[in-house]
Curated annotation (Swiss-Prot):
Keyword hit for Oxidoreductase: yes
Pathway assigned to this chain's UniProt record: Porphyrin-containing compound metabolism; bacteriochlorophyll biosynthesis
Annotated protein name in UniProt: Chlorophyllide reductase subunit Z
UniProt record, GO biological process: bacteriochlorophyll biosynthetic process; photosynthesis
Taxonomic path: Bacteria, Pseudomonadati, Pseudomonadota, Alphaproteobacteria, Sphingomonadales
Entry EC no(s): 1.3.7.15
Protein role: Converts chlorophylls (Chl) into bacteriochlorophylls (BChl) by reducing ring B of the tetrapyrrole.
Domain of life: Bacteria
Record's catalysed reaction(s): 3-deacetyl-3-vinylbacteriochlorophyllide a + 2 oxidized [2Fe-2S]-[ferredoxin] + ADP + phosphate = chlorophyllide a + 2 reduced [2Fe-2S]-[ferredoxin] + ATP + H2O + H(+); bacteriochlorophyllide a + 2 oxidized [2Fe-2S]-[ferredoxin] + ADP + phosphate = 3-acetyl-3-devinylchlorophyllide a + 2 reduced [2Fe-2S]-[ferredoxin] + ATP + H2O + H(+); 3-deacetyl-3-(1-hydroxyethyl)bacteriochlorophyllide a + 2 oxidized [2Fe-2S]-[ferredoxin] + ADP + phosphate = 3-devinyl-3-(1-hydroxyethyl)chlorophyllide a + 2 reduced [2Fe-2S]-[ferredoxin] + ATP + H2O + H(+)
Subunit architecture: Chlorophyllide reductase is composed of three subunits; BchX, BchY and BchZ. Forms a heterodimer of one BchY and one BchZ subunit.
Length: 494
């Protein structure tokens, strides 16, 4: 058994629930205790998608001791179903407790369909991947439609597969992918599952191509639809390749759109790149820990396209256990100047007092992105990401420069020489000059070397002052490795 530190994803029924509730005309029954709705839906979606309580067509069976130990879940499910619209189809998803007692059995005389999320075995993305295909199997046509020739002047149709609740930055990225598809002259058919009606699911099979929004889930459905599909791009070069490949498949010319984008959407990117922050780009390292879609895309864009050094990059992949112990160790050892990640990474930075700038790029964490002006994907996303990096550098510079009030509180600079009288500091300890032993000096150099280049000078000063203050507090004439360690433990430095 492997103990997972700070879990970064939910179980299977969360993913299935977020997919099913995104479809219009489908009601969802969660077979489990009341918390199985309160946590993933009422609580979490409020902090990630800004959804008010009871916004979605969900009911929970509310299993208690009676059902768990004696009667089973069937009667509770029938009571839950009776509160829904009997004319509309419903699907039941089972939480882990319900799965352990064999729950999810649909009562006779109802129109409830059953989907088994396998929440004990699968994470939210694995289950979401199966849920998308299940919707097509249950509500799509029995036979896959054959591709039909387009009429003269008719636009090719492209579906966007994957947008659903609980996905970081989804509204902005969906808007950008739609803009790109329409920009080259195609038409967006079905956005699935978000906002798609049950009756429109069958239209998925009539498109000329599909775009898979995320690497975590959606590809299984894209394969099932038997149409060419393309991965939604993150970054400059990836977006250009995406547009050209999609256009070639659809028989369109993307170059006029790409040329317009260079003078409009992408123009601020080059202006930002030539701005006053350009002096720091070669040394302003970044780290990223996020879903594979963003971790892979942002690293490729910032490191390969733009030349920023990458301190580390970790992808959260479907079905792969997280390595948060390694993430924590890397952040503690070499904190980057710009950290893209989730609440977990922000917490790890705070543990060591890291002064790098944090940019939300993943869940878990409270980060609402309902507005469509914060894309990571496409050309707009490339410009937005560089803008975020530039602003992070400005913010880092602000914290490097000392405040006037802090300078006023500082102790006077000591004069050198044996005849200078010893003065008492604010804590009563002598403020005489101290020396550094070899081990402490070597450790200081190591700690400073671990810091981003931009903040090394200020980090070295804070660390040196704190260690010397610790030595003086002991009445010592020499800063030892122990003094340095005390300063680190007290959080006075770096």
């Amino acid at each position: 058994m492997t103990l997972v530190l700070d879990h970064d994803r939910a179980g299977g029924y969360w993913g299935a629930t977020y997919v099913f509730t995104a479809v219009k005309g489908l009601q969802v029954i969660i077979d489990g205790p009341v918390g199985c709705e309160n946590l993933p839906v009422t609580s979490v979606l409020h902090y990630t998608d800004a959804l008010p309580p009871h916004e979605l067509p969900i009911v929970v069976t509310g299993l208690g001791e009676e059902e768990l130990g004696k009667t089973g879940t069937e009667a509770a499910m029938k009571r839950a179903w009776q509160t829904l619209d009997p004319e509309l189809p419903a699907v039941v998803v089972t939480g882990s407790i319900s799965e352990m007692i064999g729950g999810g059995v649909t009562p006779e005389g109802t129109n409830i369909k059953r989907f088994l999320p396998r929440t004990i075995d699968e994470d939210q993305w694995q289950s979401a991947d199966r849920a998308l295909t299940w919707l097509w199997t249950e509500f799509g046509p029995k036979k896959m439609p054959q591709p039909r020739p387009r009429k003269e002047g008719e636009k090719p149709v492209v579906n966007i597969i994957g947008p659903s609740y609980g996905m970081f930055n989804m509204p902005s990225d969906l808007a950008e992918i739609r803009r790109l598809v329409e920009g080259i002259g195609a038409e967006v058919g079905v956005v699935f599952p978000l906002g798609c009606h049950l009756a429109d699911i069958r239209k998925l099979g009539t498109a000329d191509a599909n775009v898979c929004m995320y690497r975590e889930f959606g590809r299984n459905l894209c394969e099932t639809l038997e149409r060419p599909y393309f991965q939604a791009p993150v970054g400059l070069s990836s977006t250009t390749k995406f547009l050209r490949a999609l256009a070639a498949e659809l028989g369109l010319d993307p170059e006029p759109f790409i040329e317009r984008e260079k003078h409009t959407t992408i123009k601020p990117l080059w202006d930002l790149w030539r701005s006053v922050t350009q002096d720091f780009f070669a040394t302003a390292n970044f780290g990223i820990v996020a879903n594979d879609t963003y971790a892979r895309g942002i690293r490729h864009f910032l490191e390969d396209d733009m030349g920023l050094p990458c301190a580390f990059a970790y992808s959260r992949e479907a079905g792969v256990k997280p390595r948060n112990d390694e993430v924590r160790e890397d952040i503690h050892k070499s904190p980057p100047l710009v950290m893209f990640g989730s609440y977990n990474e922000r917490m790890y930075m705070a543990e060591v007092g890291a002064r790098g700038k944090f940019i939300p790029a993943s869940f878990p964490g409270a980060a609402i992105r309902r507005h469509i002006g914060t894309p990571f994907m496409g050309y707009s996303g490339a410009t937005y990401l560089v803008q975020e990096v530039c602003n992070a550098l400005f913010d880092a510079l602000f914290h490097i420069l000392p405040l006037g009030t802090d300078m006023d509180k500082g102790q006077a600079t000591l004069a050198r020489g044996a005849d200078v009288p010893v003065k008492a500091g604010s804590n009563g300890a002598p403020t005489h000059e101290v020396t550094w032993d070899t081990e402490a000096k070597a450790r200081l150099d190591e700690l400073v070397e671990e810091q981003p280049v931009l903040i090394r000078i200020s980090a070295a000063k804070r660390l040196r002052d704190a260690a010397e203050a610790a030595a003086r507090a002991k009445g010592a004439d020499t800063v030892t490795k122990d003094c340095l360690q005390e300063a680190l433990l007290e959080g006075e430095a770096v």
